[in-house]
Amino acid sequence: MPWIQLKLNTTGANAEDLSDALMEAGSVSITFQDTHDTPVFEPLPGETRLWGDTDVIGLFDAETDMKAVVAQLEQHPLLGAGFAHKIEQLEDKDWEREWMDNFHPMRFGERLWICPSWRDVPDENAVNVMLDPGLAFGTGTHPTTAMCLQWLDGLDLQGKTVIDFGCGSGILAIAALKLGAAKAIGIDIDPQAIQASRDNAQRNGVSERLELYLPQDQPEAMKADVVVANILAGPLRELAPLISVLPVTGGLLGLSGILASQAESVCEAYAPLFTLDPVVEKEEWCRITGRKN
């Protein structure tokens, strides 16, 4: 169905108040957007970190009387009569279909392809992971996921056990299994991610070799030959004591979700127990790998 969009500009400090005002005026959803396209990285849990100059965008049903909406908003103390705004009619689109049409098979390293479950594989003889991301992250399109997939593709995983810490869609754990790992363990704090991983594992015929846990349910003294964690720099630093004990002696560690500017602090957290390789960078992100001492 078609929609009407109302956009207004404000400061980050006032964005939440104006979001509430738009919802009270009948908006069905709110989007915060940086006026100047400045990225915001790594908000704290539960935090909505906003920009100094923020566009607040309300989405309204096409039948909404926008003159009445504007009149109501003019009564808000942060806006007033004649406040600056922009109203647009949005064309009707099948957004899910548009997203699916833009998700194409991607190659990582020498052997590995990530393929949308609704498309044909480009190479039947390759290692093909059929993926439906569902509600969890992890399609291979982000540089951090891509670097982790390339790293796994370059390893000899035959008969190995792999832990995917923060498994999301299960893409890394499933890729490891398809690349020869005997067993993979996925851990995530989000039950939706656990379900997406389970569904994708079944789609790829590896569900019997994949164990999935919420953190509170994971077995004690869990160990693996290879541990990969594609989360964020803050949690990687904070969880270093927990993650560092997961690889066996001589086991391998791969970390990503890290901005290049954060690499040094993450390396410092893991250097006491690992011999670290040179940091690999892709765009503004990086990957840290090493071997357990």
Swiss-Prot record:
Q: Family per UniProt?
A: Belongs to the methyltransferase superfamily. PrmA family.
Q: What does the entry give for GO biological process?
A: methylation
Q: Which Pfam families match?
A: PrmA
Enzyme Commission code: 2.1.1.-
Give its localization: Cytoplasm
GO CC term (a single one): cytosol
> PANTHER family, from UniProt?
ELECTRON TRANSFER FLAVOPROTEIN BETA SUBUNIT LYSINE METHYLTRANSFERASE (PTHR43648:SF1)
Which InterPro entries does the record match to this protein? Answer: Ribosomal_L11_MeTrfase_PrmA, Ribosomal_PrmA_MeTrfase, SAM-dependent_MTases_sf
Q: Which UniProt keywords apply?
A: Cytoplasm, Methyltransferase, S-adenosyl-L-methionine, Transferase
Its biological purpose is as follows: Methylates ribosomal protein L11.
Q: Write down the species.
A: Klebsiella pneumoniae (strain 342)
Q: Which domain of life is it from?
A: Bacteria
Name of the protein described by the UniProt record: Ribosomal protein L11 methyltransferase
Q: Which gene encodes it?
A: prmA
Per its record, the protein catalyses: L-lysyl-[protein] + 3 S-adenosyl-L-methionine = N(6),N(6),N(6)-trimethyl-L-lysyl-[protein] + 3 S-adenosyl-L-homocysteine + 3 H(+)
Keyword ATP-binding present in the record's keywords: the answer is: no
- EC primary class: transferase
Residues at which S-adenosyl-L-methionine binds: T145, G166, D188, N230
- What GO molecular function annotation could you give as one example from this UniProt entry? protein-lysine N-methyltransferase activity
Its lineage reads:
Bacteria, Pseudomonadati, Pseudomonadota, Gammaproteobacteria, Enterobacterales
